[in-house]
Amino acid sequence: MKTIVVHDGPFQADEVFAVAFLIMYYPGLQIDMKSLMARDDYPFDLIRTRDEDIIAKADIVCDVGGKYNTHALRFDHHQFQKPEGQDYVIPKGLHGTWHEDMRITPSACGLVLDYLWYYHESKNTGDLPIHLVNRFFKRLVIGIDAIDNGMSQVSRSDSLRYRPCTISNIIAHYNSDDAFSEEQDDHFAQAVDVALFHLRYIDSGYWRDEFNFETFKETINSQSGDHLVLEQWYPSLMNMVSRANALKKYKRIIWPQLDGKGKQEYRVQVPPKDPGSFELGAPPLDGSKVNPKFPDGHKTEGDLVFVHSGKWIGATRTMEAAYKL
């Protein structure tokens, strides 16, 4: 049974997610989340300590020990020295360029993911492809690494309009009142469970999108005009539209679904101008072109279900009305 060591005391997101990534992608450490396996039955030992003898004997060490050596499975970052005049450091031994591209010093989390990507890439397992790793770095890891290394999002002379809550903040909430108690070890395990949830969410979403995209492309290729009609709604819909280079091709995207009462409706969405933008890429929805919900003061339902105040999404009762929005 392998032993993973992290430091004791207060924990942060970097070593919590480092352990979670190892559980997800390092051979022999996987656990079955659905079976609610007792932690005593995990296929590894997790030790929180700064004892140098224990650290030296461990199979994998994260965020403690003062060494970064992927061959020895040592993933600490505290010993890195920044070059003069530079606020970040890129250590020798990294396999990818994510940190260099973003000018972010890696923490234990980024070091572990970089290693795991290289491990699976070199063995051609297909379990951790580059596009999934890109998603992990973009959505989670770069931010975790930057925060753990004290790197500001903006210049320290600029004040933030508001302070966002990050995944690093949320993980910190799981620390107990006594960071050096046995209870703290249980809290660390709870934090790892939370991290695993988010990793599984991103992982499963990636494979779902890969599967759906093939059908989505076929739908796009089979239609003409500036209204894309889908047979169903897709998670990450606008990401797939963007991936298909079709954001500027369509003024409206329409799909059928049932409302909360089980009645048929047709949702209509305006694509954004750019991926992730709140600016519309086509004219806003106009509900005045559709029969109102209660026309002429009567209680008989009309064709219009709703139009969002932002005019980017709405719904009608019929496909014909959907084309008028």
What is the predicted function of each stretch?
Residues 150-267, 271:
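Glycine-rich, Lys/Arg-enriched anion-binding loops that position phosphate/diphosphate groups
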